[in-house]
Amino acid sequence: MKKIGITGGIGAGKSLICEVFQLLGIPNYPADFRAKWLQSNDPELKAKIAFHFGKEAYFENGELNRSYLSKEVFGDDEKLNLLNRLVHPAVADDFNNWCTQHADKPYVLKEAALLFETGSYKQLDATINVHANQDLRLKRTLERDPDRSEENVLSIMKKQFSDEERIDLADFIIYNDESRSVIKQVMELHEKLLQ
C-alpha cells in the first residue's frame, strides 16, 4: 500500500479533493483533525503537554484549553516548536496504526496543511499539492470561517510554505482554481497511483 500526502495552503480545497478520492474508495487520514483529537484524548501526549505548558493547558474535564495553549505558543517560535515536537510523533504513530487498518487499499491519503513544513512528507511515497492562488484561498477561507479576520488568514498564510515551495516539493499538483475540473484531475491521478 502506498502512502500519499495531500497538502496545500489554507483555503486551497484539500478537504474537497480528499472527498473526491474517498468517492473512489481511497481512505483519508485527516492529520490536522487527528492532532487536535490526540491532544485531548491521548493520555501520554496530554501528560507531556501539561508537563511542558502547565496544568492550565487542560480544563478540569480533561479537554484541551486551546485558547490558553494558543496564547502560550503564539509569537514564540521556541514554544511552538516544542509543542510540534510533542504532537507530531503522536500523529505519526496514530497514522501508522490507521494505515494497518487500511492495508487492503492500493493507497491511502494523509491530509495535512503543514506536510512539507513539518518534514512528515519524507515518510510518504508521494505528495499531492492542491493549488489555488492566494486571493482565491483568502476569499474561500473568509467565507468558510466568518469568525476569522483577513489579517488572521494572511498571518497563517505567511507561516505556511509559499505556493512555489509547495509546487517544487510536490510530486503531483491538482489545480483547484475554478478554471479546471478537479474531478477529471483526481480521476487521472487516481489511475496513475493505481499503477
Predicted regions and their residues:
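Small-molecule kinase domains that catalyze NTP-dependent phosphoryl transfer to phosphate-bearing small molecules
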Residues: 122-123, 134, 144-192
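ATP-dependent small-molecule kinase phosphotransfer cores
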Residues: 33-106
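Short gly/ser/thr-rich secondary-structure transition/capping motifs
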Residues: 89-93, 108-113, 154-159
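A general structural signal for well-ordered alpha-helical segments in protein cores
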Residues: 3, 18, 46, 66-67, ...
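Walker A (P-loop) phosphate-binding motif
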Residues: 1-33
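Residue-level signal for inorganic ion chemistry
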Residues: 13, 32, 83, 109, ...
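Well-ordered beta-strand positions
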Residues: 27, 33, 126, 171-172
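ATP-dependent NMP and nucleoside kinases share a basic, alpha-helical "lid"
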Residues: 94-101, 107-142
